[in-house]
Design a protein with these regions (language model features):
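Short conserved loop adjoining the S-adenosyl-L-methionine
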Residues: 12-19, 34
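A conserved beta-strand element that flanks and buttresses the S-adenosyl-L-methionine
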Residues: 25-28
Length: 186
């Protein structure tokens, strides 16, 4: 069989993992590292552990919300904790989960020894993307007009997201305010 499925606490399972992999996917997983990695720097330690299981030229694929995503400024609740502005305010308490900005993620990657990575920008987010943008192909004015996709939580509307996205695009800031990221680490 080409697929092995492991269920349980990552630290317990990882001790028995001996294989190396071409690809490791962390889809909606990385943000929970402080819940299952016993370390003062759980996000760094988690990536270090995962990196040990990559084959030469292997890749890690991460999908994660951007804590500075425009949807949070516009009135969506933080996806995991269900509260307004939690990520924008820097997660004042450790609650077992944390998302990151692009710069914060890049800092973590470099501390772990990943210097080659590509960011992609799923729109409206990675869970149900309509389009995936890249640094080579960023959105154009008027393209980001499908912004009312907060399926599981109530939201308020604080401004017209399409107009604000257009302003962000004009100022070359879309990678900073994308609602989520799809990242390939090499």
């Amino acid at each position: 069989s080409n697929i092995n499925i492991f269920v349980g606490n990552f630290e317990d399972i990882e001790k028995n993992m001996t294989e190396k992999y071409d690809y490791i996917t962390l889809i909606g997983v990385f943000e929970y590292a402080e819940s299952y990695i016993n370390s003062k720097k759980p996000y760094i330690e988690f990536l270090r552990i995962v990196k040990k299981h990559l084959k030469k030229n292997g890749k890690i694929i991460i999908a994660i919300e951007n804590r500075l995503g425009l949807k949070y400024w516009a009135g969506c609740k933080e996806d995991h904790l269900g509260t307004y502005f939690e990520g924008l305010e820097g997660y004042r308490e450790d609650k077992g989960i944390k998302t990151f900005s692009k710069n914060e993620l890049e800092d973590i990657f470099k501390l772990v020894g990943f210097y080659k990575y590509n960011f992609y920008y799923p729109y409206p987010d990675y869970k149900l993307p309509i389009t995936i943008y890249s640094d080579e192909y960023l959105p154009k004015l008027g393209e980001l007009n499908n912004n009312f996709r907060n399926f599981d939580l109530d939201r308020v509307v604080t401004f017209n997201e399409t107009e604000v996205f257009d302003s962000i695009i004009k100022n070359n800031l879309f990678p900073i305010f994308s609602n989520s990221y799809l990242i390939i680490l090499e």
